[in-house]
Curated annotation (Swiss-Prot):
SUPFAM superfamilies, A to Z: Cytochrome P450 (SSF48264)
Positions contributing to heme binding: C479
MF terms in GO: heme binding; iron ion binding; monooxygenase activity; oxidoreductase activity, acting on paired donors, with incorporation or reduction of molecular oxygen
Family stated for the protein in its record: Belongs to the cytochrome P450 family.
Topology in the lipid bilayer: Single-pass membrane protein
Name listed for the protein in its UniProt record: Probable cytochrome P450 520A1
């Protein structure tokens, strides 16, 4: 009986202490403490977060402001839904927030935090220069990358034509991912995977694609193994499943590496990015052994393959959905393309794309209303610090950039839930007239224009779309290759509308739901298939 009483007292003490820890003030000055909801013992604010954290965090920002704190089980988070605070944390104070938070999923994925995506600052500083040089605008505008994109796009257009002639629904999940994956595989490894299951030897492509999808779900949704690390032994099956999916991708890349290292010649021009990495790592004078270098090269390739495949494919899937729901806009895009390239032209080139203002506006609007990485990847504060208005941020706080929340907030965008590409055309006109002031990537509180007052709240960033729509993040650890995404998606959009009319394969679904399914990249919540009609 005494033992039972002791256990009850112990549990009660733990619950009370945990409640106190999660709700106490961390700043010595009460008015400098970040707002936030009350957190419960053990779970913190998990009960406030549904299956779409991007939506939940955005709703909470309406109550608690542009930066607020919330506990998810054992970790304190601060959610930032304010462009000025984002500029301060992610750019001005970059060095204090450069690291990613550690959890079991990121640790397994990243060779114990040595990768480009999840690497700690020292490792990240080593590997980033080796990768970014391959994805500059100059490199992407060179002949080989353009040739790879054109080749893959023409193959996809051919498949679309076949589907249109047969009136067969198009499985955009498979074919868009094939298109995106083959571009990055061509750049990295000089290979491509088959566009049809009949040519998929041993189902290898399907396995890799499925594993990439599962990896994204695991990383993006913060499973219980990450939220409750003290209960890790109870989640061995989940960790094992994640590891198995990662190994499918690793084995695929490793098999290519072993083939390529046999024919690698440092005296000839690199054939692809893997050749460049092999050359750079084996010329380094560091003490890493050959196996460690091999694994790091494979890891960097995985980083790019996983990130580049899903983001471009998801953006194109959203494009198809919004075109089906907006047939008049679809025709406007067609007219624009025809006016630039001519009605008899079968293919839009890279040189044509800069002339397609409405196509680009449509692309930017998709990334605003459904940014594929809606919460970006989190950072962690490396020391006690403050942000604007002296709001205190304790050391080891996870910081989340609410990209979705800013682009979909009435505080920053007029009619934010409406898909309206023309807002970007108007924005460009306003920007050309310098209506938003002279701003660079640092915080600028001068020469800014207060655009409107909404619900009593004045925002100098209202409808300043490039400031409030940041689909690739900001700062040094933003998406490494936004130019590549622009290249791959814009030319695909233009050629699809030039050659086809898009409709839903099931008229009963119309209009298609524009709700999203949350993961590290967001996708349409409800499956749909596209019916292509070939334009005459």
């Amino acid at each position: 009986m005494e033992i039972l009483t002791f256990i009850i007292y112990l549990i009660t003490f733990f619950i009370l202490f945990d409640f106190y820890k999660k709700n106490k003030r961390y700043s010595k000055s009460p008015n400098k403490e970040a707002n936030g909801p009350w957190s419960l013992p053990i779970i913190g604010g998990l009960h406030l977060i549904g299956d779409r954290p991007n939506r939940s965090f955005s709703e909470l920002s309406k109550i608690y402001g542009g930066i607020y704190k919330i506990w998810l089980a054992e970790r304190m988070l601060m959610i930032v839904t304010d462009p000025e605070i984002i500029q301060d944390i992610w750019i001005k104070q970059h060095d204090k927030f450069v690291n990613r938070p550690h959890n079991i999923t990121s640790q397994i994925f990243s060779l114990n935090h040595k990768s480009l995506v999840f690497g700690d600052v020292d490792e990240w500083n080593k590997v980033r220069p080796k990768m970014t040089c391959h994805f500059t605008k100059i490199k992407l505008n060179s002949t080989k990358p353009k040739q790879i994109v054109n080749d893959q796009l023409k193959k996809m257009l051919k498949i679309m034509t076949t589907h249109s002639l047969d009136s067969k629904p198009f499985n955009q999940y498979v074919y868009l991912n094939t298109y995106s994956m083959n571009i990055i595989l061509g750049l990295m490894l000089s290979i491509e995977l088959p566009h049809s299951n009949s040519n998929d030897k041993d189902g290898q492509f399907s396995k890799v694609l499925h594993s990439i999808d599962e990896i994204f779900k695991s990383i993006g949704t913060n499973g219980p193994e990450d939220i409750f690390p003290t209960l890790l032994p109870f989640f061995k099956n989940r960790i094992s499943t994640f590891t198995n999916h990662l190994n499918v991708i690793k084995d695929f890349i490793r098999s290519i590496y072993k083939q390529q290292i046999k024919t690698f010649d440092i005296n000839i021009e690199p054939r692809n990015i893997m050749d460049c990495l092999i050359s750079e790592y084996y010329e380094d004078d560091d003490q890493e052994d050959e196996v460690a270098k091999q694994e790091l090269i494979i890891q960097l390739c995985i980083d790019m393959l996983v990130a580049a495949t899903d983001t471009s494919a998801s953006t194109l899937e959203w494009f198809m959905l919004f075109m089906i729901n907006n047939p008049n806009l679809q025709e406007d895009l067609y007219e624009e393309v025809v006016n630039v390239v001519g009605k008899d032209c079968p293919y839009v080139t890279f040189d044509d794309v800069p002339k397609l203002a409405l196509i680009k506006a449509c692309y930017f609007e998709i990334l605003r209303i459904r940014p594929v990485t809606s919460l970006s990847l989190p950072r962690v504060s490396m020391e006690d610090t403050t942000t604007l208005n002296d709001i205190f941020i304790p050391k080891d706080t996870i910081i989340i950039q609410n990209i979705f929340g800013m682009g979909n907030s009435e505080k920053f965008v007029s009619n934010p839930t409406v898909f309206n590409p023309s807002r970007w055309l108007e924005y460009k006109k306003m920007k050309d007239l310098n209506q938003f002031g002279n701003r660079d990537d640092s915080i600028d509180t001068t020469n800014t224009t207060t655009n409107t007052t909404l619900n009593g709240t004045t925002s100098k960033y209202y409808n300043d779309l490039e400031r409030v729509s940041i689909p690739f993040g900001v700062g040094k650890r933003r998406c490494m290759a936004p130019s590549m995404a622009d290249h791959n998606v814009l030319i695909a959009m233009a050629n699809i509308v030039l050659n086809f009319t898009m409709k839903s394969s099931d008229p009963k679904q119309m209009p298609l739901s524009e709700e999203e399914q949350y993961a590290i990249t967001i996708k349409p919540k409800y499956p749909f298939k596209v019916l292509f009609e070939k334009r005459s």
